[in-house]
Amino acid sequence: EGGTNFTNSLLVGTSSTGTLSTATGNIGVGQTVFAALTSGDNNVAVGRDSLKCNTTGTENTAVGNQALCGNSTGNYNTAVGSFALLDVDAGADNNTAVGRSSMITLSTGDGNTAVGAQSLRSATTPGNNTAVGFCALYTNTTGASNVAVGKSALLSNTTGAENVAVGATALLDNTTGGNNVAIGLE
């Protein structure tokens, strides 16, 4: 179902597209992928509801159940894993989320990288964060320019900025502090 103007696009699935009025070069596989798409180009969506709300966003890649589901106009985002970048919305560009529920609540932040299930899970608007490891930067909401490498590194950080935590549970209890460097366990 959906529109009929599928210029250079491949679409497979039930109710898989919006109107695709001027959209080109899109690949969609799964139920309700690209349900709102109008003019976004060169997107890839694989998995139920992936890129479901995308209207004009360009060059996004979503693989997994509801990956990048809320994206409407964001560009150059990559989400791999169920619920990865689920709530990302207008104005969120150049984000990469790999792992189940990574960056699930991000709405408008740019340039974030999350690798690991539930990494950067609570992020809403921060930018330029790097989280690698299960639950790294888990509760970070608006803190920017943080680097967390290791399981639960910077786990409790909410608004602290420009921190570097390397190692499992490094800077575990930091919530708002900034400009810290920790290497090793908590």
Regions found by a protein language model. Give the residues of each.
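Glycine- and small/polar-enriched repetitive beta-structure motifs of secreted/surface proteins
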Residues: 1-186
